[in-house]
């Protein structure tokens, strides 16, 4: 992880001189997980190792990459299907982690989360990661990305490591599980300047909550008669939406755009065409 931190420090330094060339921080850790023991089904001892991808930082021209590989080696982990065939484990889910992307004009990529359950025998588990306290930083008013998370589920109880993302030799038996979530990337630019349709799509895909869309991005959403998720222009007096309009008009003024004071600006911000 030291090389990741060094890289981020250098990027921050370069961002002072060339703000439009440097992305926000990536997830910066691979959230290593190891489990070992005796497999009574296959009749042999085993050690399973897994690391996670995470979100890259948003950058000047687009959102960050979701579930990107570790930047140190660019290595890829084994597929969960292969590991289920080789070891006494079952992955109950492996998915993008909702809300983990740092908000921004160009948001960070999403981190991942998975829950793996021991299906037979006994073993010991260990985790080694980072970013459990501070998420990947954002740039130019972008928000911090989501943090790493680790949970052990043993005997029906939830256990979080004392050092959040670091623990070793945790006894596990059949039925116990471990949940590991990787960080999302930091956001780039002010979230209030994000394209409204991009916000709507993230909510539609259940990657962002409707409340976060309203309070962070200033986008109010509702369902139309066909059940499609659309921007609710009738609620344009909501404080968050008014703030978004004011922010965007301010940006237009700073950039010297024509018609920045025109009342049509609010309609332009809120209008999203409804797809058939």
For each predicted feature, which ranges?
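Acidic, low-complexity intrinsically disordered tails
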Residues: 272-276
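Glycine/proline-enriched, intrinsically flexible loops and inter-domain linkers
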Residues: 1-261, 265-267
């Amino acid at each position: 992880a030291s090389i990741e931190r060094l890289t981020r420090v250098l990027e921050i330094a370069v961002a002072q001189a060339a703000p439009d060339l440097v992305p926000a921080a990536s997830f910066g850790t691979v959230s290593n997980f190891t489990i070992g023991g005796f497999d009574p089904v296959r009749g042999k001892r085993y050690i399973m190792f897994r690391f996670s991808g995470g979100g890259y930082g948003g950058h000047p021209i687009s959102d960050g990459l979701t579930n990107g590989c570790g930047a140190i080696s660019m290595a890829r982990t084994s597929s969960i299907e292969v590991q289920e065939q080789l070891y006494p484990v079952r992955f109950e889910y492996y998915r993008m982690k909702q809300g983990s992307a740092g908000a921004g004009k160009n948001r960070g990529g999403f981190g991942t989360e998975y829950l793996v359950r021991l299906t037979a025998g006994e073993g010991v588990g260990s985790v080694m990661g980072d970013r459990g306290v501070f998420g990947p930083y954002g740039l130019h008013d972008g928000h911090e990305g989501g943090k790493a998370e680790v949970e052990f589920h043993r005997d029906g109880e939830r256990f979080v490591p004392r050092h959040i993302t670091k623990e070793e030799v945790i006894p596990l038996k059949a039925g116990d599980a471990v949940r590991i979530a990787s960080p999302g990337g930091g956001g780039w630019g002010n979230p209030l300047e994000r394209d409204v349709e991009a916000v709507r799509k993230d909510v539609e895909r259940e990657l962002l909550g409707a409340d976060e869309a309203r309070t962070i991005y200033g986008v109010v959403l509702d369902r139309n008669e066909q059940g499609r998720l659309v921007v609710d222009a009738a609620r344009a007096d909501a404080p968050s939406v008014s703030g978004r309009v004011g922010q965007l008009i301010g940006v237009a003024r700073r950039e010297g755009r024509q018609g920045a004071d025109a009342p049509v600006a609010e309609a332009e911000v809120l209008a999203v065409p409804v797809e058939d």
